[in-house]
Amino acid sequence: MKANHIRILLLVTIAIMFISLMGKWEQTFPADNTKQQTSATQNNSHYDNADSSTNTDVTTTDAKSSLAKETNFSKYDNAKSITINTGVFKDVKVSLLDGAIISASLKDYSISLDDKTPMSLLTDKSGSEYIAKSTIVVNKQPISVNFEDQGIKIENGKQILTLTGSADGLQITRTYTFDDTKYNISVSQNIKNTTSAPVNVIVDDSFARDFDPAGDSFSLLNAHSYTFTGVAYSTAKDSFRKESFKDISKTNGQPTVINSDGQGWVAFLQHYFVSAWIPQSTNAKIYYKNLNGDVFEAGAFTGATIAPNQSENISSILYTGPIIKANLVDLAPNLEKTLDYGMLSFFSEIIFWVMNHIHSLVGNWGLAIILVTCLIKLIFYPLSAKSYRSMAKMRMLQPRIKRLQETYKDDRQALGKKMMELYKEEKVNPLSGCLPMLIQIPIFISLYWVLLESVELRQAPFIFWIHDLSMKDPYFVLPVLMGLSMFLQQKLSPAPADPMQAKVMMFLPVIFTFLFASFPSGLVLYWLTNNLISISQQWIITRHYQATHKK
């Protein structure tokens, strides 16, 4: 295959690879539960396997009708609530009905560039409800608790809200501890059995969300549609698994229960943000399910048998906030994996680490992208220089190649043989021009996921009209400049021998301009910067080579 054929294939492969394959892999290839579900059994409630003696890894149940009533969002409408504000949270509302957290806004993250209102990660807004709750279950039946507010006290700089309530012979004291600078909330409860008989109690920490999976569709020209929305969890056997809401909606209401076999966690994931329950016990079980229609629930429940006049302490940590590795790594094992950069995460993490350090110095993510690009080009300069010298030599051979083409225009086999002899004689590798492009593929894909998944770049401005590097260029200036740079780069490269190939190559900048028009502007900025540096390097090396090899 000719060198120009290879170049064309590589260019097209880049687009197809990260758009059609990498871009969609999270939605197309969700976690496969086949291996675990070999031990699945059918039951009438996801609490049926709550005993600590149960060893089932995964249990699917068929209790849709009985579970649908567990989350009735409207029941919180008329209940009183306590509002708490911290350095990172605005208007955290804790309902006195069951102690559910029905609203929490993030002070440092606005809804959009145009709407600076803090975004509500948890919300009781009708039609888009998303709440965190801790349900008391007695003898495998959820009970409702009307709590009383015992006030908020400040201790070591932390706000501690205490609620007390009683139901079905249980006295419950629940505390919520808020750290002023953190997104994690400690939820602890003391449950006392005031009856004359032992009571089997379960504390079910869960999320419930009204979400339409049909609206979470993939679009080739919308980069943000590649992101994941659904459930994630971690156990001793599975360090990190995900299940999209779209896939869960196809389970016909059958909850899936997983034995954590140690400290695990369960979370609702969305673009840039995560809400996670982290039980502090080692015998918790994790579950997720589609309650009915567009309502999804996931949680972790811990069981205990409380003797008469005895009490049990059960604690959990609730995290609801941005997906920032530094915030998550110490909360629970593998929680930082919710920052999922895909198959090339190793390279992505290195790129982000370097970018983050540069950003701390220059204070602008756009400049950080440019400087990272310069650094990458510097590291790979020896390979690029070798490739450009080979291309310069190929360019100088063009007159001889054209003479061969004219001489053997009716004998393509002989032409191919003579050209290979020429390459061998002049010690030229016609494929070496592809090397810089091959090097760019993993870097390009890695940076793509960094720009798409890193919340630090959400609404990050660059200059002038670029107000958000994670979104497309609103005026398409960068994609057009990138297309022009590709066209200029082609002019510096050896011309294709085949006229048809030359026409195809001429249209590639147009095709890529169209594709890049929908990509995050930060990614286009990287590609444009990379092209401009490559053009400069190639021009200098070509001029120098031609000056020193004139005959």
From Swiss-Prot:
Required for the insertion and/or proper folding and/or complex formation of integral membrane proteins into the membrane. Involved in integration of membrane proteins that insert both dependently and independently of the Sec translocase complex, as well as at least some lipoproteins. Aids folding of multispanning membrane proteins. It comes from the Bacteria. Residues 50-59 have a biased composition (Low complexity). The chain crosses the membrane at residues 3-23, 361-381, 431-451, 504-524. GO terms for molecular function: membrane insertase activity. This is Membrane protein insertase YidC. It comes from Francisella tularensis subsp. tularensis (strain SCHU S4 / Schu 4). The gene is yidC. CDD domains: 5TM_YidC_Alb3 (cd20070), EcYidC-like_peri (cd19961). GO terms for biological process: protein insertion into membrane; protein transport. Residues 33-47 have a biased composition (Polar residues). Its main location: membrane. Residues 33-59 are annotated as: Disordered. Interacts with the Sec translocase complex via SecD. Specifically interacts with transmembrane segments of nascent integral membrane proteins during membrane integration. The lineage of its organism: Bacteria, Pseudomonadati, Pseudomonadota, Gammaproteobacteria, Thiotrichales. PANTHER family: CYTOCHROME C OXIDASE ASSEMBLY PROTEIN COX18, MITOCHONDRIAL (PTHR12428:SF65), OXA1 (PTHR12428).
